[in-house]
Amino acid sequence: MLDVSRHFMPLPVIYRTLDGMAAVKLNVFHWHLTDDQGFRIESKRFPLLTAKGSDGLFYTQDQVRDVIAYASARGIRVVPEFDIPGHVTSWLVGMPQLGSVQRPYEISRTFGIWDGALDPTRDSTYKFLDAFIGEMGALFPDDYLHFGGDESNGADWKANPSIVAFMQSHNMKSTDELQTYFSIRLLELVHQHHKQMVGWDEILTPGTPKDAVIQSWRGVESLAVAAKQGNRGILSAPYYLDGMKTAESMYLDDPIPDNTTLTPDQQKLILGGEVCMWAEQITAQTVDSRVWPRTAALAERFWSPRQTRDVPDMYRRLAIESIRLDSLGLTHISGPESGLRQLAGSEAAASQLAILISTLSPVSFSDRYQQQKTSQLTPMSNAVDYTRPDPPLREDLRLLVNPYLHSATPSDYATAHRQLQILFQSWIASGPALDALAPEHPKLNQLTLRRSQIVQLGKLGMQSLASIESHTLPSTTWIEAQNKLLKTSADHSELTDFVILPPLQQLVDLTAKH
């Protein structure tokens, strides 16, 4: 799933995403086309939707047809999502008469859950939806249409006396029951246009029709409820890429876990997993580094038995696959490299910055939002935007330290020692080099603490190697100081996390055994 509403993604992003999907055999492109921040698809029946709800950033129907044809040629289905009845601010800017509360609407620049919602009690709402579904159903040939259904808080429904009266007259005790009513009527319209409906967890209630497909962002427990109720389902909760989790942690989450409570027949209702890339904190320049290569690992998870769990071998192959994806034109490597050159001002300076950046990963979406209060207008061209989730050094450093932890040949041990020395020395040198550049390139000051810490961590590494090689026990004071450094370096700082700390901790621990 690619969200193109929060930040619009130009067509080249769409095409190269499809190229990457084809390369790793992902076969459904879920296109999140509407949300509070933008209505991104042309409607000829209702042109005000894009005229006032898109900032002029949307796909024409001819462009959509081209994307569908491009995807189809690569064995990929395209399933559009039109998120209703909530997350509809961009719809209501041009068509406020569809709203539950009549007021002026503006495109949301910030992110969250807003009160605006379609009025589910008026026949005019369903007349509009009938026409809209007919138009979009004809444009998208796939059997499925996704209508969201998530995070409608019910506030505007409760604020409208006529809606409250409708609920009372229909013996509805909560807005959840009103949403079920809406979902049932919506599903009837979808069926009339010979389509099937997909929605998020929120559309699932005891009254939800069995042929609605549930996509779960809440987790395996929620998905299990759907399956036990007889609904087909798709798991997405563990595969939200904006959580910035490692490929390892996501790879180990199977859509049907070992401890599932589902019967064999109920397990057949789980259609699989779906990777989700939400766009609150990405742009066209950074999206690929958030999606790839981690998504390749998830593609393998979805196509493999749950017993496939060899993480080191997965990383070995993922490194190779990452280079192959780069050769296909994906920008998960070249995009951050370009960004670092913009920050540092020259290729030579960027090479020094890259040393520091290679040790860092961005904090999760929620952590960044809490610290920065990101919005649609927040610049996404800062140091954190050019860090990569689960960067290669995380696994590479683990492999380099392994000969110190396990029996290794003298040759392997010597090679690891030499490479670790080179790495640690590069960390020590990068800090002063970046300090010298910072006055002329102020964005480097976004990583002031990390610049200092990487020097200290490099010295920790060199001193640990020296102690281990000489079989000399370091002082208790030294060990305490290094453990304190590792602990403070593990804190979220400057919107980043170090990915190098566990192997360094292992080296410090080893010094006490010699």
Per-range role (PLM):
Residues 122-144, 165-514:
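Substrate-binding groove of N-acetylhexosamine-processing glycoside hydrolases
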Residues 1-195:
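Substrate-binding cleft of carbohydrate-active enzyme catalytic domains
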